[in-house]
């Protein structure tokens, strides 16, 4: 009798679950992907991630932000990364053409940015732009492995302020200081550190991206947007990364996120944060 009773209870429970429309497959497991993105993308990426997740309740996109050079090295060393969004083509080329870590067919040029010379509000600086930046009391400058630091060095070379070099990223801040008459230079690990150093008044001027001034309009003054003929285009490429730890659902979601970043909806968000979306893919 006890066995029959148990069978009846089990059958009743099963019928109740069926009546409620319950299916084990209805509850999807959470899918988490990791996106490595340049520090200058921090603000816009948070909104892009939120927008992407709106229609994907089981998806969690985790952003990790630093200089593109630092992130590239982490990926090469085996860090768990599904998508890489770089502030320069150089680092993406390294992962793609040299390391073979980019998933074929997923690489896209997404946005363009512009390097600016900035100062803090009320600084009364005598600097008007790149050509007379030596007149500053101090300069916040990203190191050469950081894209904004490389673009700044390239602009200085093209403007005749620095001697030509086979690899401008190797030009040290000491070399730059000497070329500019001994001005004090604060070497920074990424563009976010440069932005903070100037906005807080720790350094008189610095070079950042136009997008880095978003939300800081009351603290930063743009002295000059450096022309593209000095820096070259500041293209941001994105791609899915070969991740041996990712399962099929994670790999699919990573590809979907890359595809989302080149949609019209994403472009509107990029433009809000001062990025130029008129780029050739």
Language model features by range: what are they?
Residues 76-77, 108:
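Short glycine-biased active-site loop of nucleotidyltransferases that positions the nucleotide triphosphate
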Residues 63-73, 80-97:
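Ligand-binding clamshell of periplasmic/extracellular solute-binding protein-like
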Residues 56-62:
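A generic structural motif
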Residues 1-24:
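Sec-dependent N-terminal signal peptides of Gram-positive bacterial secreted proteins and lipoproteins
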Residues 74-75, 197:
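CheY-like receiver
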Residues 20-50, 54, 69, 89, ...:
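Exported/periplasmic ABC-transporter solute-binding proteins
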Residues 58, 80-81, 203:
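Short, high-confidence coil segments that cap the C-terminus of an alpha-helix
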Residues 98-106:
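A short, gly/pro- and small-residue-rich
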């Amino acid at each position: 009798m006890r066995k029959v009773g148990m069978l009846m209870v089990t059958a009743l429970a099963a019928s109740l679950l069926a009546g409620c429309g319950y299916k084990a497959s209805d509850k999807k497991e959470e899918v988490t992907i990791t996106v490595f993105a340049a520090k200058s993308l921090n603000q816009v990426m948070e909104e892009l991630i939120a927008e992407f997740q709106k229609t994907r309740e089981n998806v969690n996109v985790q952003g990790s932000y630093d200089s593109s050079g630092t992130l590239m090295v982490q990926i090469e060393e085996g860090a768990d990364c599904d998508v890489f969004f770089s502030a320069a083509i150089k680092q993406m080329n390294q992962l793609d053409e040299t390391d073979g870590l980019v998933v074929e067919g997923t690489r896209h040029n997404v946005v363009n940015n512009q390097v600016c010379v900035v100062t803090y509000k009320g600084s009364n600086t005598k600097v008007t732009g790149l050509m007379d930046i030596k007149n500053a009391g101090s300069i916040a400058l990203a190191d050469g492995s950081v894209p904004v630091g490389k673009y700044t060095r390239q602009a200085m070379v093209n403007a005749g302020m620095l001697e030509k070099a086979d690899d401008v990223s190797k030009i040290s801040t000491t070399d730059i200081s000497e070329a500019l008459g001994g001005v004090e230079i604060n070497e920074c690990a990424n563009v976010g550190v440069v932005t903070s150093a100037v906005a807080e008044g720790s350094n008189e001027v610095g070079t950042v991206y136009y997008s880095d001034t978003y939300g800081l309009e009351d603290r930063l003054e743009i002295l000059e947007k450096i022309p593209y003929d000095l820096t070259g285009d500041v293209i941001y490429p994105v791609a899915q990364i070969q991740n041996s730890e990712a399962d099929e659902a994670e790999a699919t979601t990573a590809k979907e996120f890359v595809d989302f970043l080149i949609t019209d909806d994403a472009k509107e968000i990029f433009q809000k944060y001062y990025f130029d979306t008129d780029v050739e893919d």
